[in-house]
From Swiss-Prot:
Gene of this entry: CYCD3-3
PANTHER family hit by this protein: CYCLINS
InterPro entries: Cyclin, Cyclin-like_dom, Cyclin-like_sf, Cyclin_C-dom, Cyclin_N, Cyclins_cyclin-box
Family: Belongs to the cyclin family. Cyclin D subfamily.
Lineage: Eukaryota, Viridiplantae, Streptophyta, Embryophyta, Tracheophyta
Segments traversing the membrane: none
Protein name, entry field: Cyclin-D3-3
Keywords: Cell cycle, Cell division, Cyclin
Biological role stated in the UniProt entry: Promotes divisions in the guard cells (GCs) after the guard mother cells (GMC) symmetric division.
Gene Ontology biological process: cell division; guard mother cell differentiation; seed development
Signal peptide: none
Pfam families per UniProt: Cyclin_C (PF02984), Cyclin_N (PF00134)
C-alpha cells in the first residue's frame, strides 16, 4: 500500500503536465505545417531551426531599426570637394583592407566613421592631407573594434599613401574622431541586417556563406557611390538582398521583396529607387557592359550568343568568326571544321555504344 502511494506521488507531476504536453504537440503540428508551406516557397531556407527564437528576433530587429543613424549626408552630396575627398579616402581604405585581409565590417565601419566625421567637421581646402589622416584614423579605429590582430599605426600607411604621419599624430586624430562621434563606434550597418535575416530565416549551410559573401561584396562595391548616402541601412540592405536573391534564383523575387519590406518596415518607393541604383553595380550587368564595349575583331565580325547560367546569371559568350577575306583566317576555319567533325563522330559513337549496351543479350 505504501509502495502504491509512493508511485502515485512520483507520477503526479507528470499527470499535471499532461495537458501542457498535448497543447505543445498540437502547436508543434501547426508549426510543421507552416514550415512545410514556407519550404515550398523558399527551398533554400530551413525555417524550423529559428521558430523558438522569434520573440527574441523581433526584439533585436526593432532595436536595429530604432538605432539606425538618420540620413544627414546632404552636405556631402552638395559639396564636390567632399565627394572627391570621400572617393579618394574610400579607395585607399579598400586597398588597405585587401592588403591586410580585414573583414568587410571593418571597412564598412571605417567608411561610417569617415562619413559621420566629415559631416561634423569642416575640411579646409588648403589642407589636402586632412582627408588621408582622417581615413587613416577611422580605419585604425575600425580595426581595433573589429579585428583580432591590428597592425601598428605606422604599418597602416601602405598602398600608395601620399603622406606619412607619425604615430602621435595619428593617435591625436583618433581622439578627435572619437570625441566628434561621441564614442559611438558600433553603428547599425547593412551587414547588421544581413546577419539578422540569415539567422532569422536559418539559411541552409550551402546557401548561407554564398548569400552573405555576395551581399557583402555588392555592398562594398556600391559604398563609394555617394548617391547611396541618402538611404538608410535597412533600405540599402533590402535592395542588396533582393538583388542577390535575383541573381542566385533562390526564390520568387517579388515575394521575397514583399516579405523583407514588411519585416524591416521600409518604404517600398525608397527600396525601388535604391534597387535601381544597385542594379547599375550588379556583377551580371557589369559583365554584359564590358563585353558590349569590347572593340570589334580585325579578323572578322563575331556573332555572340549569350547563355545565362541558372545559378548566378553569369553571361557566357560563344563566338564564331565569320568568313573573312584575309588568308590568315583559313587555317582557323579549317581547324574549327575538323573539331566539329570530331565532335559529331564522338557523339555518333556514344549513341552507338548506348544502343549496344541497351540491347538485350
Amino acid at each position: 500500500m505504501a509502495l502504491e502511494e509512493e508511485e502515485e506521488s512520483q507520477n503526479a507531476p507528470f499527470c499535471v503536465l499532461d495537458g501542457l504536453f498535448c497543447e505543445e504537440e498540437s502547436e508543434f503540428h501547426e508549426q510543421v505545417d507552416l514550415c512545410d508551406e514556407s519550404v515550398e516557397k523558399f527551398p533554400f531556407l530551413n525555417l524550423g531551426l529559428s521558430d523558438h527564437d522569434m520573440l527574441w528576433d523581433d526584439d533585436e530587429l526593432s532595436t536595429l531599426i530604432s538605432k539606425q543613424e538618420p540620413c544627414l549626408y546632404d552636405e556631402i552630396l552638395d559639396d564636390e570637394f567632399l565627394v572627391l575627398c570621400r572617393e579618394k579616402a574610400l579607395d585607399w581604405i579598400f586597398k588597405v583592407k585587401s592588403h591586410y585581409g580585414f573583414n568587410s565590417l571593418t571597412a564598412l565601419l571605417a567608411v561610417n566613421y569617415f562619413d559621420r566625421f566629415i559631416t561634423s567637421r569642416k575640411f579646409q581646402t588648403d589642407k589636402p592631407w586632412m582627408s588621408q589622416l582622417t581615413a587613416l584614423a577611422c580605419l585604425s579605429l575600425a580595426a581595433k573594434v573589429e579585428e583580432i590582430r591590428v597592425p601598428f599605426l605606422l604599418d597602416f600607411q601602405v598602398e600608395e599613401a601620399r603622406y606619412v604621419f607619425e604615430a602621435k599624430t595619428i593617435q591625436r586624430m583618433e581622439l578627435l574622431v572619437l570625441s566628434t562621434l561621441d564614442w559611438r563606434m558600433h553603428p547599425v550597418t547593412p551587414i547588421s541586417f544581413f546577419d539578422h535575416i540569415i539567422r532569422r530565416y536559418s539559411f541552409k549551410s550551402h546557401h548561407q556563406l554564398e548569400f552573405l559573401s555576395r551581399c557583402e561584396s555588392l555592398l562594398l562595391s556600391i559604398i563609394p557611390d555617394s548617391r547611396f548616402l541618402s538611404f538608410s541601412p535597412s533600405v540599402l540592405a533590402t535592395a542588396i538582398m533582393v538583388s542577390v536573391i535575383r541573381d542566385l534564383k533562390m526564390c520568387d523575387e517579388a515575394v521575397y521583396q514583399s516579405q523583407l519590406m514588411t519585416l524591416l518596415k521600409v518604404d517600398s518607393e525608397k527600396v525601388n529607387k535604391c534597387y535601381e541604383l544597385v542594379l547599375d553595380h550588379s556583377p551580371s550587368k557589369k559583365r554584359m557592359m564590358n563585353w558590349m564595349q569590347q572593340p570589334a575583331s580585325p579578323i572578322g565580325v563575331f556573332d555572340a550568343s549569350f547563355s545565362s547560367d541558372s545559378s548566378n546569371e553569369s553571361w557566357v559568350v560563344s563566338a564564331s568568326a565569320s568568313v573573312s577575306s584575309s588568308p590568315s583566317s583559313e587555317p582557323l576555319l579549317k581547324r574549327r571544321r575538323v573539331q566539329e567533325q570530331q565532335m559529331r563522330l564522338s557523339s555518333i559513337n556514344r549513341m552507338f555504344f548506348d544502343v549496344l549496351s541497351s540491347s538485350p543479350r
